[in-house]
């Protein structure tokens, strides 16, 4: 049985073998001069953290920021998507500079640790400020530095804490699901904008100049149920996984809880048939699932054997993800028996789709060493008597590779009797060889830090792709402070990187046009 499980989990090993070194610990010191910058940033961030703002539920935070900006004398436009737009006049002496848009998004991915009581629709984020470590984290949940950090930095700029030319502030919504906020921006909203600085990147030593496209794959089916014939119901659950952003961290070899559990169930099914009651896991399409659970029904006599098989499966997974997923846990517990269960053929089809789908790294770039070109993440699964829904997010910097993956999903769904809908997600953002922003940022960074800033393309979607499509030729970059483990409860922001980004912007916003 153990050999069978290891074979079924081979696809998971493929990703782990491609894993680069994990993120380094936070570092850096904050000077007395920069303490005021950090203090104001923290105050802004805590204001945001007090307002629940999961994707698709940004009305409250949009209203709060609208009122905040209006109190500062800004004339704010709020569209139907709850995006916010307002202009900030230039500091005296800088009125002749070109109009620069500063753009961030208001929503966040809300994920809680196992056992942590958290309702993302009603509960604030409990921010932990550790001055000694120089970090912001959250108590038991994601922090929301993606992209609360960008919003908080912009808030400090709007307050007048640095000199600048004319600015247009753009706060968008729903970036984390389908970028519907950015897609609601019109050409009129971008009138006269010469440059756009997106503050949604997660490394202060890097300027991002290109990003990948993605798609939203939703696979569904109508439950086919039959009367249960087995008398013992159990819940098999996987938990304790790292999770994280499915673009930025997909190459780190982290375990996908849904795919791993489906692999375990497949192995059990081949050895001893069971009846599937439900299968669920994941909280966002673009977050690697940290946990998943299935309720199955078995013969009472098979209970001890099942627990042994699950133990073998856990051991196989720990071997596959050694050094990466040290907190991985698989458990078996009693569940309430169901009267109706999935017919075995459909249950097998669901598990086959989950395990046979592309998950993790698909191709690596042949141009940029170490860059993932194409990948996919099985982000959510909800299988019960009420319905079947499986959500995936493929990404690629190659339109051909993205189309190739989409074709594979369609074929696999058809083979397993499922329906599929594929929608366009983020747009590709190609690098601009004629950019003025990039060389200016390189010069400023070199002057301020005595080293070269990294110029990178990323394997993730940024709203810059939407703005590129809307205003072809717009000169754009993406920058941001140091954030690790975004989209996971371990999300951490390096406070020393806030002044670093601040001083970069401080010079950039007065040099453009000179």
What are these regions (language model features)?
Residues 94-194, 230-233, 364-365, 370-372, ...:
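Active-site metal-coordination/substrate-binding segment of hydrolases
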Residues 26, 30-134:
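Acidic/His- and Gly-rich active-site-bordering loop/insert found
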Residues 210, 227-231, 250-280, 300-375:
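Acidic-enriched catalytic cores of C-N bond-cleaving enzymes acting on peptides and small amides
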Residues 165-257, 265, 269:
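Fold-level recognition of mixed alpha/beta catalytic cores in primary-metabolism enzymes, strongest
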Residues 46-50, 293-295, 329-341, 377-381, ...:
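A short beta-alpha structural unit
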Residues 33, 37, 41, 366-389, ...:
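Zn-dependent metallopeptidase/amidohydrolase metal-coordination segment
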Residues 1-30, 245:
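Gram-positive cell-envelope targeting signals
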């Amino acid at each position: 049985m153990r050999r069978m499980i290891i074979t079924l989990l081979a696809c998971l090993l493929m990703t782990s073998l491609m894993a680069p070194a994990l993120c380094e610990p936070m570092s850096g010191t904050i000077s007395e001069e920069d303490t005021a910058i950090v203090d104001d940033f923290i105050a802004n961030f805590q204001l945001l953290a007090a307002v629940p703002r999961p994707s698709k539920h940004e009305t409250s935070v949009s209203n709060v920021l609208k009122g905040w900006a209006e109190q500062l004398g800004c004339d704010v436009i709020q569209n139907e998507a709850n995006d916010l737009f307002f202009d900030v006049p230039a500091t005296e002496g800088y009125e002749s500079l070109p109009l620069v848009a500063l753009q961030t998004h208001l929503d966040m991915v809300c994920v809680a640790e196992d056992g942590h009581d958290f309702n993302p629709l009603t509960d604030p984020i409990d921010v932990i400020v550790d001055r000694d470590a120089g970090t912001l984290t959250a108590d038991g949940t994601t922090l929301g530095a993606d992209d609360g950090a960008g919003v908080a930095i912009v808030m400090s700029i709007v307050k007048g804490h640095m000199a600048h030319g004319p600015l247009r502030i753009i706060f968008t919504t729903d970036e984390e699901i389908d970028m519907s906020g950015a897609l609601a921006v019109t050409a009129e909203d971008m009138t006269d904008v010469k440059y756009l600085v997106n503050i949604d990147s997660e490394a202060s030593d890097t300027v991002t100049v290109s990003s990948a496209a993605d798609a939203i794959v939703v696979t569904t089916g109508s439950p086919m149920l039959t009367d249960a014939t087995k008398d013992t119901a159990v819940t098999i659950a996987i938990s304790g996984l790292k999770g994280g952003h499915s673009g930025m961290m997909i190459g780190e070899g982290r375990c996908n809880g849904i795919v791993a559990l489906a692999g375990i169930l497949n192995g059990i099914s081949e050895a001893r048939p069971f009846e599937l009651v439900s299968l669920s896991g994941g909280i966002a399409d673009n977050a690697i699932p940290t946990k998943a659970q299935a309720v199955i029904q078995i013969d009472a006599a098979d209970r001890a054997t099942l627990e042994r098989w699950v133990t073998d499966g856990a051991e196989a997974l720990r071997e596959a993800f050694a050094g990466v997923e040290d907190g991985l846990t698989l458990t078996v517990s009693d569940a309430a028996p169901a009267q109706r269960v999935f017919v075995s053929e459909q249950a097998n089809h669901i598990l086959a789709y989950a395990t046979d789908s592309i998950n993790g790294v698909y191709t690596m770039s042949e141009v940029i060493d170490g860059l993932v070109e194409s990948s996919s993440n099985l982000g959510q699964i909800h299988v019960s008597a009420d319905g079947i829904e499986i959500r995936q997010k493929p990404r690629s910097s190659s339109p051909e590779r993205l189309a190739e993956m989409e074709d594979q999903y369609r074929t696999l769904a058809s083979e397993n009797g499922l329906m599929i809908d594929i929608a366009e997600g983020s747009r590709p953002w190609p690098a601009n060889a004629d950019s003025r922003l990039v060389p200016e940022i390189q010069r400023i960074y070199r002057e301020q830090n005595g080293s070269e800033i990294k110029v990178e393309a990323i394997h993730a979607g940024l709203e810059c792709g939407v703005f590129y499509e809307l205003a072809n030729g717009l000169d754009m970059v993406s920058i941001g402070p140091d954030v690790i483990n975004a989209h996971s409860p371990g999300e951490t922001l390096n406070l020393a990187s806030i002044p670093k980004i601040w001083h970069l912007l401080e010079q950039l916003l007065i040099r453009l046009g000179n």
